[in-house]
Amino acid sequence: MALLYLDPFNKVVKTAAGDFKFDDAIFMGHHQAADLVWKLGAVGKTADGKPSNWAAVHPQFYNMKDDPNVFVIGDSVGAVSPQFGHYPKSGHVANRMGRSVAQYIGQQAKGQPMTPVMIDNLCYMLVNTEPLEAISVKFDYKMGPEGHLLQTVTDDIFRRPQLWQEDLRWYGQMVKDFTGG
């Protein structure tokens, strides 16, 4: 949906589809792979030969098709499946990709073939503070019979405090992974 005009004072956004009032909103600009990916020449091409704006990588190993020793993870990764397109652009996905790439590099260093590691994605949404309530969505991936990644989505929309606590544990693990602590 193309943004025509944003009025943050009156909290109205105007689009080709109409005007929408909002209480709170997050607006995100155009996304694309990081500058380094462009400089490396790792951006893929669309069917008509134009830049895809995303790194062209193997859908399971995240390495470049032209150089299997160069890996790209996280938000810069392009489409990996005809079923769902891109992995979600999330910290959880980048974390899981990073873990699996570390394993792949270790396997390469030992002269072993890379063994695919199927990542997942998990997103908690803290929806209320009084009482504490959260919901979640989980994405699982597997290789389909035709050699394409398949995605299964599980929505957990039953609001409850246990999911809030699970989110805090998840966050703690992400911090440990990030800091090495």
PLM regions with names:
Residues H92-I119:
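Internal hydrophobic alpha-helix adjacent to the cofactor/substrate pocket in enzyme cavities
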Residues K21-D24, M28-A94:
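FAD-site-proximal beta/loop scaffold in flavoenzymes
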Residues F84-M97, C123-K138:
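Short, electropositive alpha-helical surface patch
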Residues N53-V72, V117, V127-G147:
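FAD-binding beta-loop-beta segment adjacent to the flavin cofactor pocket
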Residues M1-K11:
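A conserved short coil-to-beta-strand element within the FAD-binding core of flavoproteins
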Residues L3, K14-D19:
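A structured beta-alpha segment of the ubiquitous adenosine-cofactor-binding alpha/beta core
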Residues A134-G181:
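C-terminal auxiliary extensions adjacent to catalytic cores
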Residues H30, S81, Q103-G106, K110, ...:
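Hydrophobic alpha-helix feature that most strongly marks membrane-spanning transmembrane helices
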